[in-house]
C-alpha cells in the first residue's frame, strides 16, 4: 500500500510539470518559435551594424537592445499566430503542419487569433520605446505577412513566395531603425539580401513538399509549373545575391571573402541541380545550404565589426 501511495503522489507531482511542458510546446508551435529565433538573428545583426556605423556604444544602449529584440520577437510571433489561425483549414493537409494546435484543436482558434493580435500590439509598443520608425517598419512586416501574403497571394498566385519575402526581409531593418532612423545604404542592402534569400529557400522547401502543397491547394511554383522552371528561378534568385556583399565593403576584406564564397558555393550547387537527376535530393541540399548561409553570413557581419 505504501508503494502504491508513493507512486500516486509522484504521479500527482508530475502532472503539473507535464501540463506546463505541453503548454510551452503548443505555444512554440503556434508562434513558430523557429521562425522567431532565426529572424532575431537578422534583427540583432541589423541593430549591431547600426551601432557600429553610427558610433553609438552597444553597452550604453542596452535598453534599446532589449526593447528591439523583445518587440521584434513579439511582432513576429504575433504575425505567425495570426497566420496559424488563418491557415488552419489547409494546414491539416500537410504533414509538417497537421499537428499544429490550431489543427488538432488543442488550442481554440479564437484564442490563437487574440494571442496574435495581443503579441503584435505589445511588440509594437515595445518598438515604440526605441523609435517610431522601427514600430512602423514592424507593422509593415505584419501587414505584408498577414494580409498581402497569408490572406491574398498564398492561396492564389505562384508569386506568393516573392510577396512573403517582403515581410521576411523586414527584421534587420527593424534592428537598424531602432538605433538610427535616417536613410543608410546598409539597412537597404540587408533588406535586399533577406528578400533575395527567401525565394530560393522556400522554393527548395516547396520542391521537397510539393505533393503536400498540391493536396492543400497552395499554388507554389513547383506545383503549378514543375521542377525545371523552379530550379531555373532558384538559380536566378541566388545569382542576384552575388553583388550585394560588395556594398558592405566597409566591413572588410575577410567578410567579403566569406560572403562571396557563400554566394558562389550556393550558385554552383544550384547549377549542379540542372544536371542532377534526383530533384528532391537536390532540393534538400539547397534548403540546408540556405539555412547555413543565412546564419554564417549574418554572424560574419557581426564578427567583421569586432575583428
Curated annotation (Swiss-Prot):
It is a multi-pass membrane protein. The keyword Transmembrane helix applies. The chain crosses the membrane at residues 33-53, 62-82, 111-131, 132-152, 159-179, 185-205, 229-249, 251-271, 287-307. The keyword DNA-binding does not apply. GO terms for biological process: heme O biosynthetic process. Its main location: membrane. Carbon 2 of the heme B porphyrin ring is defined according to the Fischer nomenclature. Belongs to the UbiA prenyltransferase family. Protoheme IX farnesyltransferase subfamily. HAMAP family: CyoE_CtaB. Converts heme B (protoheme IX) to heme O by substitution of the vinyl group on carbon 2 of heme B porphyrin ring with a hydroxyethyl farnesyl side group. This is Protoheme IX farnesyltransferase.
Amino acid at each position: 500500500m505504501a508503494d502504491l501511495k508513493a507512486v500516486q503522489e509522484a504521479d500527482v507531482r508530475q502532472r503539473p510539470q507535464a501540463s506546463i511542458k505541453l503548454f510551452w510546446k503548443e505555444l512554440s508551435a503556434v508562434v513558430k518559435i523557429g521562425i522567431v529565433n532565426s529572424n532575431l538573428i537578422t534583427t540583432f545583426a541589423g541593430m549591431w551594424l547600426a551601432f557600429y556605423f553610427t558610433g553609438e556604444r552597444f553597452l550604453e544602449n542596452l535598453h534599446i537592445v532589449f526593447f528591439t529584440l523583445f518587440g521584434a520577437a513579439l511582432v513576429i510571433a504575433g504575425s505567425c499566430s495570426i497566420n496559424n489561425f488563418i491557415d488552419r483549414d489547409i494546414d491539416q493537409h500537410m504533414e509538417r503542419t497537421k499537428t499544429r494546435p490550431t489543427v488538432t484543436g488543442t488550442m481554440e482558434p479564437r484564442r490563437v487569433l487574440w494571442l496574435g493580435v495581443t503579441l503584435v500590439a505589445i511588440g509594437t509598443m515595445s518598438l515604440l520605446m526605441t523609435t517610431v520608425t522601427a514600430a512602423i517598419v514592424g507593422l509593415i512586416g505584419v501587414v505584408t505577412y498577414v494580409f498581402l501574403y497569408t490572406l491574398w497571394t498564398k492561396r492564389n498566385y505562384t508569386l506568393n513566395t516573392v510577396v512573403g519575402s517582403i515581410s521576411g526581409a523586414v527584421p534587420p531593418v527593424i534592428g537598424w531603425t531602432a538605433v538610427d532612423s535616417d536613410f543608410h545604404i546598409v539597412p537597404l542592402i540587408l533588406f535586399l539580401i533577406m528578400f533575395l534569400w527567401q525565394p530560393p529557400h522556400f522554393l527548395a522547401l516547396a520542391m521537397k513538399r510539393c505533393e503536400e502543397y498540391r493536396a492543400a491547394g497552395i499554388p507554389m511554383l513547383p506545383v503549378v509549373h514543375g521542377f525545371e522552371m523552379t530550379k531555373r528561378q532558384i538559380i536566378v534568385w541566388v545569382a542576384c545575391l552575388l553583388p550585394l556583399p560588395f556594398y558592405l565593403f566597409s566591413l572588410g576584406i575577410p567578410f567579403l571573402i566569406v560572403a562571396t564564397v557563400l554566394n558562389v558555393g550556393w550558385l554552383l550547387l544550384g547549377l549542379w541541380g540542372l544536371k542532377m537527376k534526383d530533384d528532391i535530393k537536390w532540393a534538400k541540399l539547397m534548403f540546408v545550404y540556405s539555412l547555413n548561409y543565412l546564419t554564417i553570413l549574418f554572424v560574419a557581419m557581426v564578427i567583421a565589426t569586432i575583428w
